[in-house]
Regions:
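Glycine-rich, often proline-containing surface loops adjacent to acidic residues and nearby aromatics
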Residues: 16-18, 33, 66-73, 172-173, ...
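Short glycine-rich or small-residue beta-strand-to-loop segments that form or flank ligand, phosphate
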Residues: 21-23, 73-76
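Short Fe-S-cluster ligation motifs
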Residues: 58-75, 240
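Residue-level recognition of the N-termini of beta-strands and the immediately preceding loop/turn
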Residues: 70-72, 102-105, 142, 243-247
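Auxiliary Fe-S-binding modules of radical SAM enzymes
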Residues: 191-323
Length: 323
């Protein structure tokens, strides 16, 4: 994206109308180095405070120019790798601007599960939580998008205490994870994990389809199997855990939700819809692909009826870069 004066913003992504992703330059690493991660290593080594100030101002200006944006998602890497004093430079800039369109600040992080001490005993743990409180007291909703890949990650006392301390600030924790072959491709585990998350006061949010990273051939789960795992787990939990959605692919046209396998006019098909789309008119529109038990991504699927999916022409015209 860019500002109206032509300034290009390299640390941002505005794919969906209401949500802006922001990549602080100081968050381009993580407490964990998951081999299935889809965020490639990014730049470091700049004059941190100076760069943060400038980025914060540009983010505010972009939000002023785009009143349709209600949510800012801090991502990376992992924003919680930053010291609290550095992270607050960004959040204070947003709060001080008193933007009427900004309703929610989201933080995508693995720290809750992988390094809970960020919120317990690190030198800036208390300052981090005070910053969370400040955001909430401003009237802005704070959502911690916590990555939990397995039930066992919820079993330790530090994890439970970190969740408690975060929730005491008024922040809400929503949980998400990719479905990973050899790791968590088990419906019973997912059901128990969602139930445990609810018991700890968290909200199950997404089951993702693992992206096309270097390890996809190991971690990838066929879409048909992924949907069956999700559906089986979904049936085992109460309504409080049925806030979760999936399996979802963050593909080029948007977040593609695999609804299930059906039969139309004697033809076995896969039913899908967009939970988020490059164009808001695409969201919620059902579409169908030929049944393919080996497909692991949207690109592997073929339209069940016609030669193209309904969004393809507009996607190609508006969003495909030409040489």
């Amino acid at each position: 994206p860019q500002l109206k004066d032509g300034t290009k913003l390299y640390g941002m992504q505005h794919k969906y109308d209401e949500t802006c992703l922001f990549f602080p330059s100081q968050s381009q690493t993580c407490h964990a180095y998951c081999s299935f991660c889809f965020r490639w290593p990014q730049f470091v080594g700049m004059d941190e405070m100076k760069f943060a100030m400038r980025e914060g101002e540009q983010l505010v200006q972009y939000l002023k120019e785009h009143p349709e944006i209600s949510d800012v998602l801090f991502t990376g890497g992992d924003p919680m790798i930053m010291k609290a004093s550095m992270f607050s430079v960004y959040t204070d800039a947003l709060l001080d601007a008193k933007l009427p369109n900004l309703k929610t600040i989201r933080i995508g992080t693995k720290a809750v599960s992988y390094w809970p001490y960020k919120f317990l005993t690190d030198s800036d743990a208390d300052e981090t939580l005070k910053n969370f409180e400040k955001i909430v007291k401003s009237g802005t909703h704070l959502a911690i998008m916590a990555h939990f890949n397995h039930l066992v990650e919820l079993s330790t006392d530090p994890i439970k205490e970190a969740i408690k301390r975060i929730r005491n600030t008024g922040a809400q924790i929503r949980t998400q994870s990719p479905l990973l072959a050899h790791i968590n491709d088990d419906a019973d585990m997912w059901a128990k994990m969602w139930q445990k998350q609810v018991s700890l006061g968290c909200i199950p949010y997404y089951m993702f389809v693992v992206r096309d990273t270097g390890a996809q051939q190991y971690f990838g789960v066929p879409l048909v199997k992924a949907e069956k795992i999700f559906r089986t787990a979904f049936r085992k939990v109460s309504g409080l855990a049925r806030t979760v959605r999936g399996p979802s692919m963050s593909a080029t046209p948007g977040k593609v939700h695999v609804l299930g396998v059906s039969e139309i006019n004697g033809q076995k098909v896969m039913a899908l819809q967009l939970l988020q789309g490059r164009e808001s008119e695409w969201v919620g529109v059902p579409f169908f692909a030929k049944y393919d038990e080996n497909a692991i991504w949207l690109d592997d699927l073929e339209p069940a009826f016609g030669k193209k999916f309904f969004f393809e022409d507009e996607l190609k015209t508006k969003y495909t870069k030409t040489a």
